[in-house]
Amino acid sequence: MTDAPELKAFDQRLRDEAAEEPTLEVPQGEPKKKTQVIAIYGKGGIGKSFTLANLSYMMAQIGKRVLLIGCDPKSDTTSLLFGGKACPTIIETSARKKLAGEEVQIGDVCFKRDGVFAMELGGPEVGRGCGGRGIIHGFELLEKLGFHDWDFDYVLLDFLGDVVCGGFGLPIARDMAQKVILVGSNDLQSLYVTNNVCSAVEYFRKLGGNVGVAGLVINKDDGTGEAKAFAEAADIPILATIPADEDLRRKSANYQIVGIPGTQWGPLFEGLAHAVGEAPPIRPKPLSQDGLLDLFTPEAIGADFKLEPATDADMRGKNAAAKKSLEVIYDDA
């Protein structure tokens, strides 16, 4: 069975659009209200979605208007907020509506729970497009929906921090956010990502940008102290420390919100909500690779390992026969 001709034409149009340079512009006019747009970065699996779902819920409970936007192609930012139910993404909905000749409406892509508004930008299927370009396209669609006229106290953007693609760095590169929040833990890989984001912030500050780092949320804290040492070395504040606790792990796995006033974990997330709102954007001091490694004990990172250079013979293996020389050797006269 072959695709209908109109589907092939539609597929080609999408490919043509993906090949175009992004045209998203940062608005120059004065906003109607001072909304804090905050981008959250961290290593995949470090707990950004858990942190953001509970943070946004607590913000709403203390009277703030909050919009949570998932900017990760996995589209799992809002799952915890909505009890494990997946939202239709903006990218997916836009493609479907466009094929049907319809316009995307707010109710197609934005959903709410107890005062929190949330949506997912989404991204291409695996192997079928650029995730960063999908983020850019998603923000262009948000502008068409009236993003800059919306009335919120906070807009929280959940970004993947493991990649260096410009699309995922959009809030930093184009001053779309006022500040960045980092989520990390006491392990080298998560701090490597947070340090990379600090480097990106500092790079664009040197180019005249205004985005700064508000601070670090230490998640799954086991008390070993590496994340705290990183924050001190990078000169950024710690906004909250979330312990490695079995109750938190179990409730997160069951899609339960814990950032509720009057509960065991309520004070933790209420404190985080206030800290996020009040923390100023500052210029971080990114660490060098050696500086980052120095935060850990030699045993933890294999610092006593020595690099052994490979040789041409190593690479050739069984084919490492002696090369015939074309050099002409003359007998002694």
Curated annotation (Swiss-Prot):
- Which pathway is it part of? Porphyrin-containing compound metabolism; bacteriochlorophyll biosynthesis
Q: According to its UniProt record, which cofactors does this protein need?
A: [4Fe-4S] cluster
Q: How is the cofactor bound?
A: Binds 1 [4Fe-4S] cluster per dimer.
Q: What is its EC number?
A: 1.3.7.15
Q: Which top-rank group of organisms is this from?
A: Bacteria
- Molecular function terms in GO for this entry? 4 iron, 4 sulfur cluster binding; ATP binding; metal ion binding; oxidoreductase activity, acting on the CH-CH group of donors, NAD or NADP as acceptor
The chain's disulfide connectivity reads none
Q: What class of enzyme is it?
A: oxidoreductase
Q: Keywords of this protein's UniProt record, alphabetized? A: 4Fe-4S, ATP-binding, Bacteriochlorophyll biosynthesis, Chlorophyll biosynthesis, Iron, Iron-sulfur, Magnesium, Metal-binding, Nucleotide-binding, Oxidoreductase, Photosynthesis
Compositionally biased intervals (Basic and acidic residues): 1-17
Q: Which reaction does it catalyse?
A: 3-deacetyl-3-vinylbacteriochlorophyllide a + 2 oxidized [2Fe-2S]-[ferredoxin] + ADP + phosphate = chlorophyllide a + 2 reduced [2Fe-2S]-[ferredoxin] + ATP + H2O + H(+); bacteriochlorophyllide a + 2 oxidized [2Fe-2S]-[ferredoxin] + ADP + phosphate = 3-acetyl-3-devinylchlorophyllide a + 2 reduced [2Fe-2S]-[ferredoxin] + ATP + H2O + H(+); 3-deacetyl-3-(1-hydroxyethyl)bacteriochlorophyllide a + 2 oxidized [2Fe-2S]-[ferredoxin] + ADP + phosphate = 3-devinyl-3-(1-hydroxyethyl)chlorophyllide a + 2 reduced [2Fe-2S]-[ferredoxin] + ATP + H2O + H(+)
**Binding-site list for ATP:** 45-50, 74, 219-220
Classification via SUPFAM superfamilies: P-loop containing nucleoside triphosphate hydrolases
Q: Could you state one GO biological process linked to this protein?
A: bacteriochlorophyll biosynthetic process
The UniProt annotation places Mg(2+) binding at: 49
Q: Quote the Pfam families the UniProt record gives.
A: Fer4_NifH (PF00142)
Region annotated Disordered, chain positions: 1-30
Output the InterPro entries linked to this UniProt entry: BchX (IPR010246), NifH/chlL_CS (IPR030655), NifH/frxC (IPR000392), P-loop_NTPase (IPR027417)
Write out the residues that bind [4Fe-4S] cluster.
130, 165
Quaternary structure and partners:
Homodimer. Chlorophyllide reductase is composed of three subunits; BchX, BchY and BchZ.
> Main role?
Converts chlorophylls (Chl) into bacteriochlorophylls (BChl) by reducing ring B of the tetrapyrrole.
Q: Which NCBIfam families match?
A: BchX
Belongs to which family? Belongs to the NifH/BchL/ChlL family.
Name-wise, this protein is Chlorophyllide reductase 35.5 kDa chain
What organism is listed for this UniProt entry? Answer: Cereibacter sphaeroides (strain ATCC 17023 / DSM 158 / JCM 6121 / CCUG 31486 / LMG 2827 / NBRC 12203 / NCIMB 8253 / ATH 2.4.1.) (Rhodobacter sphaeroides)
